[in-house]
Amino acid sequence: MGRIIGIDLGTTNSVVATVGAGGCKIIQNKEAEQMTRSVVGAYKNDFLIGTPALNRWPLAPRDTVISIKRLMGRSASDPEIESVKKSHLYEITEPSDGSREAICVKMAGEEYTPVEISAMILKKLKTDAEFALGDPVTHAVITVPAYFSEKQIDATREAGIKAGLTVMKIIDEPTAAAVAYGIDSREQEAKTILVYDLGGGTFDISVLMMSAGAYAILDREGDMWLGGDNFDQIIADYVIDCVKSEFGVDPAENHRFMATLRMETKKAKEALSSAPMATILIPGLLRDEDNDILDVDLDITRDYFVEKSRPLVAKTVALSKKALKNAHLTMEDIDYVLMAGRR
């Protein structure tokens, strides 16, 4: 049996770790990053995965797949899929055999299932871990959101198998977060934990009880369609509205501009966490009705972003209150609050 790794297969980023004598250690990928971007792009009859795919996204927006986790275990008949199609630049469709109980994406004119795309990401994580560890990696524990359906869990397991891994266990992300952040489950006295996990594409809120080395989920709530991507969209919508107003141009059909905008919105969002203002600069990708080149140079304030974000934050608060109510607890009953997630 080869080495065992733990994988956080995220909507936006994925992380690999291993446990040894020195405890849990995150494994860097071949790009010397602790996080691998959950992005796959078609390039010259092959695939780029992670940062290389992300860097080429503006050049090949229709052949670059992001946020595939949101499509795992879904079907073309799911009502939420229509809104997802509008927010992504690559094609999302039912398989060519006409089955509405499945879904696929297209890259370079070929169809791929979400399981196949996820398997490509997992394969890179496996290969990079083997490179870093110097040993074969054969087994993995993979995390999924607490509210994932059995169909979505099965799809994740299938992706792991396609990547050449023996999936030892699928573990829910809140429990994994509690373990990873060192909350001591060995205490004999029962403790309650509220895990608030706002990821790139999904939101999870879970109430856990820990005692004598064991965790139990008292209640879980979540929103598959609420995450960092939605906060990015606030900034993207602001830029699109400004471009329409200032230049009389709708940039939505310019896929190269929109891909670049998505990358710039993430940078702006992160900048606004520590600065009162951020600048979005995208030169030369748009033209006006006279075919003159347009440069987009806009500022967005933290106050504007915070105000527009309030409805999204309110959703997470409402789900948190619902989870506490279902668990028959109040905030005074919570011993630990763990806030997890990134970007």
Q: Regions from the language model: what does each represent?
A:
Residues 1-86, 91-99, 106-120, 127-343:
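Oxyanion-binding/catalytic loops of NTP- or PPi-dependent enzymes
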